[in-house]
């Protein structure tokens, strides 16, 4: 692909990303206001704690229409089985979408933690652009070649985001991990129970996770994200934020060695045994040591 053509395609990607986040926010909120989208559609592959409901289809339908409208050659991988989106011919790009992060909460009537996330990758599987929409607050997180940004649509503002520089696990850190499901919570506490007894009194455990969390890492809201058995479908749509921010996102082996996490097309239903995302290498290494030596 020639340079000018590449710029043109990247511009289309950026446009689709903003259109998607804007339209998905509006349509999901509209359906939520009517109490729609709670019909159960099925289970999620390798995710006994999760379920697919009607609201999950909204984002997928919007994105499919947009990529076809802009005549993009792309394949986008989604969380539910058989819901990948293909447009055009041989893909020039790949995508990963989490159409609605907060399904279980929405189904149970909680107006809390509703997000949608979307990332695009080049043919070499490198992140090009990522976006997260905070549906309830009408805020959009964007990661592109210019950096990471937060757009507050109600206030009409756009600010640049920067990560934390915390390096010491014994300090006043903010660690995110998904604790709402017992199967994940047990593994986290198995690794961190002893350390937690000596946590700094102002240490904060943010009990949420998923594809949106990487925008929080890029914004300095959290210092690290730790997950055991993390589904790739919860990483791919958002981890580009962390990479753009210079944060570390690694998959950890049983012996403590690790590799940079990489998007792999078609593997969204696989899991990572231990995923650590941290704002600094020093904090990453301390977390890995704690997990391996548990």
Model features per residue range: what roles?
Residues 113, 117-214, 266-294:
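Acidic beta-strand-loop-alpha-helix segment within the catalytic core
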Residues 56, 60, 188-193, 238:
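Short, highly selective alpha-helical patches that border small-molecule cofactor pockets
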Residues 81, 100, 135-136, 230:
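An acidic- and aromatic-residue-enriched active-site/binding cleft used to recognize and process polar
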Residues 50-51, 179, 200-201, 224-226:
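Short, contiguous strand/loop micro-motifs
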Residues 41-126:
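Flexible, acidic active-site loops/lids enriched in D/E/S/T/G that coordinate Mg2+ and/or position polar
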Residues 1-39, 71, 194-198, 206, ...:
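Oxyanion/phosphate-interacting regions
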Residues 94-96, 130, 225:
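Short glycine-aspartate micro-motif
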